[in-house]
Amino acid sequence: MRNDVHLGHKARKRFGQNFLNDPYIIDGIVSSINPLPGQNLVEIGPGLGAITEPVGKLVDKFTVIELDRDLAERLRNHPDLAEKLTIYEGDAMKFDFEQLVKPNNKLRIFGNLPYNISTPLMFHLFEFHKDVQDMHFMLQKEVVNRLAAGPGTKAYGRLTVMAQYYCKVTPVLEVPPTAFVPPPKVDSAVVRLQPYEVLPYPAKDLKWLDRVCREGFNQRRKTVRNCYKSLIDKEVLEELGVNPGMRPENLTLEQFVDMANWLHDSHNADK
C-alpha cells in the first residue's frame, strides 16, 4: 500500500501534507483545545478531517481555511460536517482573520500546520493577537522547542522573542512520525499559544524590535557591544542594564524591548 495515500487522497508535497491518523494523539489534541459550543473556532488546514470531525461532534458550527481545492470539496460534501462548517478555500498566509472576529468572542485557532510555512504563518497570525483567545498548533518539534526556549539556549532566536512578546507559550504533546500518513521525516509536537491581554513588555515600534532581534541573532556569537556598535553606545547599553560583554543569545525579551524602545526614542528625538 502506498504510504502517501490516505482515505483515497494522495498527499501533495507542495502543500506540505501529512495526515494525522493516530486516535490517541487526535484525542489528546482535541482535549487540549477543549472546544465548546458558541466559541469562535477556526481550523487552519483541516485536511481529511482528523481534528475537524471530533471537534464537529462537540460544537454546532465553526470555520475552516483549506488551500487544497479537493479537500475543501470533500468537506463541503461531508455527511456530518457540511452544515456545521463555513469553508474558506484559500491561503491562510494571505487570509484576513479580522473578518472572522465577532463582538466579545475572540478567535480560537487550531490546526496541523504545513511545516514548510509554519514560521511565516505564525508571524502573520501574531498581527491579529488582540483578536485571538488562543492557538493550538501541530508543528515540527524543533519549532516548538524554539517557541518555548529560554535565553542562552541553542533553540533561542528571533521566533522565540517574537512569539513570547505576544503570547504565553506552552508545549502540550509530543507526536511521533508514525502518527501521520505519510510519516514526516521529523518529530512533531503540539503547542498552545495564548496572546496576552496586556503585553508584558510593549515595544513602541515593532520595526525596531525586529531590527535588534535580527542583528542580534544573525551575529549571536559576537558580544552585544560589537553586535550593536553602529546602533547603541556601550554607555547606553549599561544604562539599560545590558552587559556589553554578553552575547545577544543571552539577552531577555525585556532587554530586547528596552533596546528597541531606546532606539525609537533616540531616532524620534533627532527629527
Swiss-Prot record:
Belongs to the class I-like SAM-binding methyltransferase superfamily. rRNA adenine N(6)-methyltransferase family. RsmA subfamily. InterPro entries: KsgA/Erm (IPR001737), rRNA_Ade_diMease-like_C (IPR023165), rRNA_Ade_Mease_Trfase_CS (IPR020596), rRNA_Ade_methylase_Trfase_N (IPR020598), rRNA_adenine_dimethylase (IPR011530), SAM-dependent_MTases_sf (IPR029063). Specifically dimethylates two adjacent adenosines (A1518 and A1519) in the loop of a conserved hairpin near the 3'-end of 16S rRNA in the 30S particle. May play a critical role in biogenesis of 30S subunits. Its EC number is 2.1.1.182. NCBIfam families: ksgA. S-adenosyl-L-methionine binds at N18, L20, G45, E66, D91, N112. Disulfide bonds: none annotated. It holds the Pfam family RrnaAD. GO terms for cellular component: cytosol. The gene is rsmA. This is Ribosomal RNA small subunit methyltransferase A. The keyword Repressor does not apply. It comes from Vibrio atlanticus (strain LGP32).
